[in-house]
């Protein structure tokens, strides 16, 4: 079986290939083309589709790896068919990354990236790209799995994808600090069943300590959906409504993108990719977000248009935006009581 994707045509019979991730790979090519790196290491290559596309569409010198001898044969055949030259390694990804350094490493596993992160952070020199499809462990649906894999506690909130993405970023950033590396998200997103983050790496003892200023906790009340941002070492009392706070974290509280980089990526995009990137660019970086249907349900209110709530928050002097992952969610630095007050005041069409 052969598939065409981007400028590549590859055989996928007998190896893992997920057609649902084509949108992600399309977007990745724009990201890779914006990065100023030359080398790209596809640690878990399978068919080799992403690495081959990186070579053809982003001009990268791709290095491929897979633990399966069958996958290695498929990759080699696909390289020949596409006229691409590249080193192909048959090895355990974590072991390979311990043996040599790579300019840009991509960890795109089936499931959790956690088993590969220590080695990836040790090896990556300038860029690190990470995918997670075990969203239940990250967003609070599987609390124990989140603790074991990512070393952070989460409960499922009304905006669980916001929590999940920040929990993933926080985990990767913490792993890298062990090697005096500071990681910052260039661009990140949530879509369907996965989270995707592209990091810039800075090798610096001082900066690797400073990233913890962007790390902390989210105090969440399941009774009224209130959220409070807490820095490392801070605590939370009972919620104003009388409910008990759950302390989610540690998670990343900083920016989910670097605007100048994301804008350059968007300039290369068309159609659905451009529309998706514009949503990401329009989104503010506040770690607090609210599901308007969930708030409206608690207070038995009719739901206003999301854009109306965003504009009302801005009129009051708060930062506010829609989210790229939920059509009825609002990100804002305003307290939840302010959002509820707006919901109460609107006469809905």
Swiss-Prot record:
Matching SUPFAM superfamilies: S-adenosyl-L-methionine-dependent methyltransferases (SSF53335)
Reaction equations catalysed: guanosine(26) in tRNA + 2 S-adenosyl-L-methionine = N(2)-dimethylguanosine(26) in tRNA + 2 S-adenosyl-L-homocysteine + 2 H(+)
Superkingdom, taxonomy of origin: Archaea
Keyword Disulfide bond carried by entry: no
Gene3D superfamilies: N2,N2-dimethylguanosine tRNA methyltransferase, C-terminal domain, Vaccinia Virus protein VP39
One GO-annotated biological process of the protein: tRNA N2-guanine methylation
Residues covered by the Trm1 methyltransferase domain: 1-343
UniProt GO MF annotations: tRNA (guanine(26)-N2)-dimethyltransferase activity; tRNA binding
Classification via InterPro entries: SAM-dependent_MTases_sf, Trm1, TRM1_arc_bac, tRNA_met_Trm1_C
Keywords: Methyltransferase, RNA-binding, S-adenosyl-L-methionine, Transferase, tRNA processing, tRNA-binding
Family according to the record: Belongs to the class I-like SAM-binding methyltransferase superfamily. Trm1 family.
Protein task: Dimethylates a single guanine residue at position 26 of a number of tRNAs using S-adenosyl-L-methionine as donor of the methyl groups.
PANTHER family linked: N 2 ,N 2 -DIMETHYLGUANOSINE TRNA METHYLTRANSFERASE, TRNA (GUANINE(26)-N(2))-DIMETHYLTRANSFERASE
Name of the protein this chain belongs to: tRNA (guanine(26)-N(2))-dimethyltransferase
């Amino acid at each position: 079986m052969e598939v065409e994707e981007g400028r590549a045509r590859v055989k996928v019979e007998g190896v893992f290939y997920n057609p649902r991730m084509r949108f992600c790979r399309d977007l990745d090519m724009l990201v890779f083309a914006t990065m100023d790196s030359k080398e790209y290491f596809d640690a878990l290559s399978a068919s080799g589709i992403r690495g081959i596309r990186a070579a053809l569409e982003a001009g990268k010198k791709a290095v491929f790896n897979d633990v399966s001898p069958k996958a290695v044969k498929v990759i080699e055949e696909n390289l020949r068919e596409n006229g691409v030259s590249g080193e192909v390694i048959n090895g355990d990804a974590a072991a390979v990354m311990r043996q040599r350094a790579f300019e840009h490493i991509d960890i795109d596993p089936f499931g959790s990236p956690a088993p590969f992160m220590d080695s990836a952070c040790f090896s990556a020199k300038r860029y690190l790209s990470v995918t997670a499809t075990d969203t239940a462990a990250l967003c609070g649906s599987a609390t124990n799995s989140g603790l074991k894999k990512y070393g952070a506690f989460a409960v499922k909130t009304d905006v669980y994808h916001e929590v999940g993405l920040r929990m993933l970023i926080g985990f990767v950033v913490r792993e890298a600090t062990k090697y005096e590396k500071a990681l910052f998200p260039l661009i990140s997103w949530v879509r369907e069943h996965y989270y995707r983050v592209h990091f810039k790496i800075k090798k610096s003892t001082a900066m690797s300590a400073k990233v913890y200023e962007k790390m902390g906790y989210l105090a969440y009340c399941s009774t009224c959906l209130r959220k409070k941002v807490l820095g490392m070492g801070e605590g939370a009392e009972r919620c104003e409504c009388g409910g008990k706070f759950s302390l989610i974290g540690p998670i990343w509280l900083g920016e989910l993108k670097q605007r100048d980089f994301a804008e350059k990526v968007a300039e290369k995009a068309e159609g659905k990719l451009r529309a998706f990137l514009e949503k990401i660019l329009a989104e503010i970086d506040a770690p607090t977000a609210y599901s308007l249907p969930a708030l409206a349900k608690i207070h038995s209110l009719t739901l206003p248009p999301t854009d109306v709530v965003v504009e009302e928050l801005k009129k009051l002097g708060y930062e506010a935006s829609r989210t790229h992952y939920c059509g009825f969610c609002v990100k804002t630095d305003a307290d939840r009581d302010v959002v509820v007050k707006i919901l109460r005041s609107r006469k809905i069409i």
